Amino acid sequence: MTLPPLSHLDRLEAESIHILREVAAEFRAPVMLYSVGKDSSVLLHLLLKAFAPSPPPIPLLHVDTRWKFREMIAFRDRRAAETAVDLRVHINPEGVAQDIGPISHGAAVHTDVMKTQGLKQALEQGGFDAAIGGARRDEEKSRAKERVFSFRNARHRWDPKNQRPELWNLYNARTKPGESVRVFPLSNWTELDIWLYIYRERIPVVPLYFAAPRPVVQRDGAWIMVDDDRLPLHPGETPQLRSVRFRTLGCYPLTGAIESTADTLEAVIAEMLVSTSSERQGRMIDHAPGASMEQKKLEGYF
């Protein structure tokens, strides 16, 4: 009997499911980082598929900065209830005590304390030896050269000059005491692949990815959504109601929207087919001096 050939998305799906099962088999205490974005939504869907009909043996971890869009938090809690996954939420208590935020302390300090340090705290407290994430190689140049199994030392630091070879679909999961591994099952996916898979599988995503009239102000060439009253307005600044959507989601004062009328999956995919800009163009932290993705990863960022 001749089996029909696998489609491009079928091959990507099979590869990702293989990686997830490999992690479950090789590591003592793996965890999946759930940032609530489109890549995390795809990763959660794959995790559920990989171990169906049983519940996934890998818990989810969300490192909450207290500055995520309100729709993201509502979506996170709703999906956790719908899928009955083991979702754990960590907020850096030291950051809370100092009331660290992107406006009061700046983007670099906020990202380091609430994201990087918060992530390291959560991994250490949970005793996790592998953390699965939804990063893709097409997102950013430092991620383009990272392995699927990315090894970190006892301080969670990444050494891009000291990576293990990965031959075909063979992964080396051995670690020394104190070391851990970041695993990226979506490494070979593109942004368009993600949206095509979401469309094919009908995966729920945060409504912020779809265009709608939203209150925004323009700062440094980016449309920043006024999500709550913590965002101080500049003198003479008045929020405008514009049809915008987000290609990437993070802390709302640091995430720029794009003007768009794409309010359906089909329209988003059509927009993606003609886009010539990076999806991370709206991440304000990427443009800060000395805040390159590689530098953040060297310090323990995901």
Curated annotation (Swiss-Prot):
The lineage of its organism: Bacteria, Pseudomonadati, Pseudomonadota, Gammaproteobacteria, Lysobacterales. Pathway: Sulfur metabolism; hydrogen sulfide biosynthesis; sulfite from sulfate: step 1/3. HAMAP family: Sulf_adenylyltr_sub2 (MF_00064). It comes from the Bacteria. Belongs to the PAPS reductase family. CysD subfamily. GO terms for molecular function: ATP binding; sulfate adenylyltransferase (ATP) activity. Gene3D superfamilies: HUPs. This is Sulfate adenylyltransferase subunit 2. GO terms for biological process: hydrogen sulfide biosynthetic process; sulfate assimilation.
